[in-house]
Amino acid sequence: MKFTTPISLISLFVSSALAAPTPENEARDAIPVSVSYDPRYDNAGTSMNDVSCSNGVNGLVTKWPTFGSVPGFARIGGAPTIPGWNSPNCGKCYKLQYEQNTIYVTAIDAAPGGFNIATSAMDQLTNGMAVELGRVQATYEEADPSHCASGV
């Protein structure tokens, strides 16, 4: 009996270690964020040269020359994850959730204070109340690019 107790304990520790969550399989928590709108993102003809994600290695202008060429237009805007020009986060897809509404937005510009998205996207997020609300507290997390249809 004395010999089986240490073996049982070793077996318990090994199985516990194998069942422990790893960073790869842990669920990411949504991050609180302020979301506002800017009608300039609703203009399909605006050149991508007018935003932080214009050119450079991570630029989007060669892929999408205008806002309207971004798949999922007008669910686009600035993101707090883009500090400025040529960010590696240019073109990433983000899930925004406000109350029971969820939208997916392609990041094309810098927005240090939170997400700043097209008015029509904000209307989708807030049930048509973008102008009335102006700014809302929501949550965000990076999403699979297929949700934004960006292919990034």
Swiss-Prot record:
Disulfide bonds join 53-90, 93-148. The keyword Signal applies. Residues 1-19 form the signal peptide. Keywords: Allergen, Disulfide bond, Secreted, Signal. Pfam families: Cerato-platanin (PF07249). InterPro entries: Cerato-platanin, RlpA-like_sf. GO terms for cellular component: extracellular region. It is found in: Secreted. Its main location: secreted. This is Allergen Asp f 15. It comes from Aspergillus fumigatus (strain ATCC MYA-4609 / CBS 101355 / FGSC A1100 / Af293) (Neosartorya fumigata).
